[in-house]
Amino acid sequence: ILQFAFEDDNSSYLPYNQPYNCICYSGTHDNDTSTGWYDHAPEHIRDKVRRYMNTDGSQISWDFIRTCFGSPARIAIVPVQDLLCQGSEYRMNVPGVADGNWAYRIKDGLLTSDIAKRLRDITRLYGR
């Protein structure tokens, strides 16, 4: 889970530490969206993310997607909320909280041809 990669300098979650026979997730249903996670992370973590991903952070969800797809992991999985650059209010599940979970729905028109093209391009670029 890529969101876990930036807590320490030698994290096994960093892409360069991932073996081929694993799965790289930007986040899961039990994590915040990549945008939400980044927005709430301490500044020193955000700085590490920006340096690692060589980004200014303005498209952080797509930076997470690109980093997952570019990892050595055999499989890369990203939540649809990351494709849509959605924040914490679109989180799927908060473990230990009984109400309000699993209510996320994709509204008509959100998955545009521009997003499909961007996903297709990054998928081809990294041989996914």
Specify the residue positions occupied by each region the protein language model found.
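Catalytic cores of glycan-processing enzymes that make or break glycosidic bonds
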Residues: I1-R128
